Amino acid sequence: MILAASFLIGDSEGFSPSIYTDKTGHPTIGYGYNVSVYSYESKRITKPQAYELLTDILKENHKALLSYGWYKNLDAMRRMVILDLSYNLGLSGLFKFKQFIKAIENKNYALAVERLQKSPYSNQVRKRASRNMEILKLGVAKNIVRKNTR
């Protein structure tokens, strides 16, 4: 689960060995690692270090999300989307999507997609959001191309 989600996120985020400012104005490094939220001492990072940071956050988020029945009852592909959202938005950001979560809880994936589509998230990361909405709706992704993330 964590490995597959990390590939999706690595593909979406891309890799940067040095700190840059993302689309929302946050200082970021590695695979979209927000240094204003999580501490990181250096101004440079290697791919293995960045991958470790990414997977550590995913493991932590996955563990926290398993306490919610709506997440625990999802199939693996849809769980990956939720993990991607939790990485991109943070857990607190994800939990603000109350109507989206309610639709997921009710297994109304078309409505969940609609809720996500109407959110600022969808405009900020269009390609990524489009892929995530496809997976939510169908339970599969048609066009996932894995780039080398290590």
Spans of features found by a protein language model:
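Long, amphipathic alpha-helical surface segments
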Residues: M1-T21, Y33-V37, I45-D56, H62-K63, ...
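Active-site nucleophile-His-acid catalytic modules used for acyl/amide transfer and hydrolysis
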Residues: E60-F97
